[in-house]
């Protein structure tokens, strides 16, 4: 039998009670990651081919995508440092995004095999970035690996750049993995290979971070990530990282997938970890459909954070899914129009009406749940369902406000929203 007092008094499900894992605070330009700072939304630019003979023009196109991501709400944008041309383009990219009102330090340079050479050949360009990312699995191999890793860390120290040590199971340090696999195979009770793989990921990240500190990089300049593609692996790896260190943690699947699959995988993994206080910055690594903007990965991250109450970005619209009681598409159309209205007006509201992002709006399709849901929102509207009178009841702050009817319900309700925002968020 259920304990009624436990149900009534237990506060463990209060979103405000999420206890964040204690991590070092890392400053990336004006953005603070870790500690009790808000979880930061990141994205990665797809990028463009940089024409060696027309660097400035190519940089302008690259900056356009970066600006679009930043304007959507990406607080940091990663770019691939994969060629000399990209390194040469950095000053022009920074110049272009500055023109649009964004700080060049939102840029995170992601280097792989070529990173060591690029920081040596273009030191003044790369120091314009806010952070660099090192993959311990492919910065170098054999005897060259430690040497190249050390040079990049020394460069970061010299220019006061934070570093994300980003381990990826698709490019994991093969020597470390082989060593652990050999050790495991010699045991009488050997563990499954996926357990060893997760262990290798965590060890690679923590050993690399420790090595960076030994070289002289402060712990408040280090962020760690361990990217995998399976949700359960992601959860287990990050729980181990959180248990073993206080480095700031970047969350994300390495390849989440396309469409609903990618969104669901990302939400499932990140929500569990964030709800348990793990994670200081996040990215949704979604495969976009051809021609589709990458801004969707920013929106997904924002929706995840807002859904669990960690951050608020836009007014929340709760809407009816529809059923046999709903008699038309009016509630669907109104929901779409309200969402569009919010999207159009948020840039202005953010400047003039602070706190509007906490607003809740309900758009319901019949009398069964319509009034009740509407009363839980700041503003709610209950449209008529099958067999109901052709009127729409509007509720404000939990109380009946007025009834709308006729052909202008949408415009009248949007006007009510606008008036509410102006009156309550100043």
From Swiss-Prot:
Q: What does this protein need as cofactor?
A: [4Fe-4S] cluster
Pathway membership, UniProt: Isoprenoid biosynthesis; isopentenyl diphosphate biosynthesis via DXP pathway; isopentenyl diphosphate from 1-deoxy-D-xylulose 5-phosphate: step 5/6
The record lists the catalysed reaction(s) as: (2E)-4-hydroxy-3-methylbut-2-enyl diphosphate + oxidized [flavodoxin] + H2O + 2 H(+) = 2-C-methyl-D-erythritol 2,4-cyclic diphosphate + reduced [flavodoxin]
Q: Name one Pfam family in it.
A: GcpE
Molecular function (GO) terms for this protein are: 4 iron, 4 sulfur cluster binding; 4-hydroxy-3-methylbut-2-en-1-yl diphosphate synthase activity (ferredoxin); 4-hydroxy-3-methylbut-2-enyl-diphosphate synthase activity (flavodoxin); iron ion binding
Supply the enzyme class, top level: oxidoreductase
Q: Which GO terms describe its biological process?
A: isopentenyl diphosphate biosynthetic process, methylerythritol 4-phosphate pathway; terpenoid biosynthetic process
Q: Entry's HAMAP family?
A: IspG (MF_00159)
Name used for this protein in its record = 4-hydroxy-3-methylbut-2-en-1-yl diphosphate synthase (flavodoxin)
